[in-house]
Structure formats: structure tokens, C-alpha cells
Amino acid sequence: SALQAEGRRFESVNAHTKQKSCEEIRETFFYFLPLLYKLSLSFCLITQEKELILQSDNYLRKRMELDVLTAISPIDGRYRGKTKALAAYFSEFALIKYRVQVEVEYFITLCELPLPQLKGIDSSVFETLRNIYRNFSEADAQRIKDIESVTNHDVKAVEYFLKEEFDKMGGMDDYKEFIHFGLTSQDINNTSVPLSIKEALDKVYYPLIEELIAQLKTYATEWAEIPMLAKTHGQPASPTRLGKEVMVFVYRLERQLAMLKACPITAKFGGATGNYNAHHVAYPEFDWKAFGNKFVAEKLGLEREEYTTQISNYDNLSAIFDAMKRINTVMIDMNRDFWQYISMEYFK
């Protein structure tokens, strides 16, 4: 009986506790209900505002086609007039074109080797293949970008594009799987980029620097006998001649330009880890290192880096850029000197 009484008391306490808990939960809910309402309302307003912002952004993006005012970088914007000649070498269009060129020339070189499966290709098609990159258009580049949106791989998109071009030629179906044979993406990138730099230097940069040097030499000759008060530490010093001061920069530029031209422009080309593993396993009878050296030198005009990992060592590119930096430093010095000559009214 005592046990039964204790049980009834426990049930009574438990029921009271449950009732009290329910009341507390109810009170808490009604206390936070207005806050929850305000929070949900704020969330809706924020969501609506975000949608308006996104709609506005989308509207602006549609309107803001690339031009000198909408370009993100002043290189392609404000200074487009000064840099547009470099677009043929350093734009994404140019990079894609150079990749196509390297892939085509590599395939042709495999045919010239020849690989056993490529013996049936008539050399008369080589010029047709080269016309793929010689006549490369923005539409071709856009086709590669469309393929890339599916593959999510830029170099693989170039390979698929070339397979489509082979299909258009007819009679090439048995050979198109040898496009990009044994290569890794960096074999294409680390040849395309150095090739673009080489051609930009040869066709744009060197002619401009040489034109500057020639103009300075002309001035140095014209002003050879013009006396000028030299200064050191901003104070009058011994006399000099204006022509000689100009020749200082001719001398500096010529030597730095020679050092730049002495830098080898090198490329990495050797498979996934730089060892031609896939090439050797597939065709051990060929000297693939000699093949790579010949291909890079004769078809691209570059020098192959002998020992690499999957990527280029980049040391020689660094040397090129450092040499260009020194040339820039010389030109900055020249500009500052002439600015000072003007401020001292040596020039008017």
C-alpha cells in the first residue's frame, strides 16, 4: 500500500511537471513569435533586395560589352591604344591559336617520323593542316570555348576541335587519335607561351626599342657640340656636352638589349613527367629525346629544356623578364633626366 501511494504521488508530480513544461513552452513560443515574424519579414525583404541587385547586375553585364571604358584592366582599357599590338600574342584568342599551332605541327612531325600508323598520310595534306592555324578565326576560338564549357579543360578542347577539323577534311578518321599523342597539357602550354613571347619580342618589342635607340643616336649626333653645365647632387659641376649625355642612354640600352637577346627562349616538351614515358612504352624503337629537340627547334624555333618535371623550369623566362625590367629602368632614368633638363630650362 505504501508502494502504491508512492506511485500515485510520483504520477501526480510527473503530470504537474508536464503541464508546467507545456505552459513554459507555450509562453516561450508566444514571446518569440513577434521576433520570428520580424525576422522572416526581414529575410523576405533582403531576398527581394538581393534579387533586384542581381537583376541589375545582369542588366549591366548584358550592356557592358568590352571596350576601353568597361575593361577591368587599364592595359586593355585606358592604354589600349598603346598595347593593342600585343593582343595578337597575349590575348586568350592568341593563346588558343598558338596551342592549335603546336598541336598541328606536332602531328605533322609524327607523320614525318613516321609512326607506323601514320605512314598512310600523304604529305600533301600538311599545308591543309597548317591552314587550320594560319587561317584561325574568332569563330574557331569560340568553337573551342564552347567545347571547353563541356570538357572543363582548355587544352582538351583544342584537341577535340582539331578532331572536328580532321573530320571536315575527310580521309583522316584513322589518324585523328594521334592528335596530342603521349603529351600532357603543359607540353602544349609550355611551348605555346614561349612561342608567343618569342614572336612578340621579334615583331613588336625589339623593333620599338631599336627605333628608340636609333632616334637617340640621331639626337646625340645633332647635339654633339652643344655645351651643357652638368650637375652632381643638384649642384653645378664640370661642363659636358648634350650629345654625350644622350649617348649614355644609347650605350645602356644597347647593352641591355643585347643581354635580353642573349637569353634563350626555352620550352618544356617531354610528356607527363618530362621523361617521354608514354612515347617510349608505345614506340621504344624511336629516340624520343632527339625527336623532341628537333621538333621544338625546327618547328617552333625554341630550345627544349633538357631536364624538367611536368612543367617548365621557367628560369629562362624569368631571365627574359628581368632583362626587360632593366631596360625599363634605363628608360625611366632617361625620362627623369630629360624631365630635369626641361625643369632647368635646358629644353623649352
Task: Map each language-model feature to its residues.
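Positively charged N-terminal leader segments that act as targeting/secretion signals
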Residues: 18-29, 35-36, 43, 51
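Glycine-rich anion/phosphate-binding loop at the beta-strand->alpha-helix junction
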Residues: 256, 310-348
